[in-house]
Amino acid sequence: MTDRRPEFQTAQFEKGLKIRREVLGDAYVDRSIAAADDVSAPLQKLLTEWCWGEIWSRPGLERKMRSVLNLGMIMALNRSAEFKLHVRGALNNGLTREEIVEIILQGAIYCGAPTSLDAMRTAQAVFAEIDGETETP
């Protein structure tokens, strides 16, 4: 995928891309990178190199803890699309559904009812999607 844009040809981009794929999954990352155009490519480069290649690769916090932090912060910001993405990432990083529900309940006290209701609905939708993916016909 990265051979499409020359600005994506850096070691830092590849480092970030690997972590991003491990957390968010190939399908999501492939869509994001493929959709990068002249307007959005600089943001994709920044996020992949610095968010994923620099911050997510730092020592000191394991990925599971980073996911806990992200869920809390994204919930507080009331960003449903990003919350949905990071619920999947949190599951990929080893959080259980029960832990995700507890994060939402903890956040309800500090972020308020509307935010927590939205976060819970979002988490439920992700759980249902995953359950649908694993069902056998």
PLM features per residue range, with description:
Residues C111-S116:
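C-terminal structural segments of small proteins and small subunits
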Residues V23-D26, S80, G94, Y110:
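Residues at alpha-helix boundaries and the short loops/turns that link adjacent helices
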Residues L47-C51, V68-M75, I103-A108:
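Short alpha-helical scaffolding segments that buttress acidic/His motifs in well-ordered protein cores
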Residues M1-K64, N92, D118-P137:
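Acidic, glycine/proline-rich low-complexity segments that act as flexible tails and inter-domain linkers
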Residues L43, K64-V68, E82, E99-I103, ...:
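Residue-level detector of well-ordered alpha-helical segments, enriched
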Residues G89-N93, Q106-I109, A125:
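Short basic/hydrophobic patches in alpha-helices and adjacent helix-turn junctions
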Residues L71, M75-V101:
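Mid-chain, well-packed structural core segment of small domains
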